[in-house]
Amino acid sequence: MLESRLNEPEAHAEDDFATLTTGGPLRWPETIKTVGYRGLEQGGYALDTITIPDSTPWNNWFRTSAIDFFDDGRMVVGNYGGDIWIVSGVDDDLLTLIWKRFAAGLYEPMGVRVVDGRIYVTCKDRLTRLHDVDNNGEADFYESFSADDDVSVNFHAFNFDLQTDNEGNFYYAKSGHGTDSDVPGA
């Protein structure tokens, strides 16, 4: 009797593929507000200050590691702990910067690039394309756009930055290849 129950799968509504691929409720509905500061215009440029959050509701350590911008001026910020944030209010005044967590759990993201409105992230183990399928401001699907076959646990083995060329190719810098070590990325 017990054996037959173990072999018969139960039907669950959550097993429906369409249900699983249409997004879901917000996981991080909170936003964080900071204030930026305009820099003095000297010569050809000014250095503005974008203040990062002092703390978050998730108590994560906020160490910025990547930055890019949407065409509408919103900023995308990655942090070393695995988060991707979207920052609104990056304008001429910088009076109200609104930080919204877009994705979490990425493996040491060190580069981010917005292409055609989609966010791509360079992680230690892959290039990830983030999808917000229900347009609620959070990534619902993390697509492995390109997996890295040379992943090291070495602390200094990072995949830095993320750039594209006019043909749509992606480029990043991979450290740790100038040694004689048998450990990849060491």
Regions found by a protein language model. Give the residues of each.
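Extended acidic/polar, glycine-enriched regions
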Residues: M1-W28
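Beta-propeller blade termini and top-face loops
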Residues: K33-A186
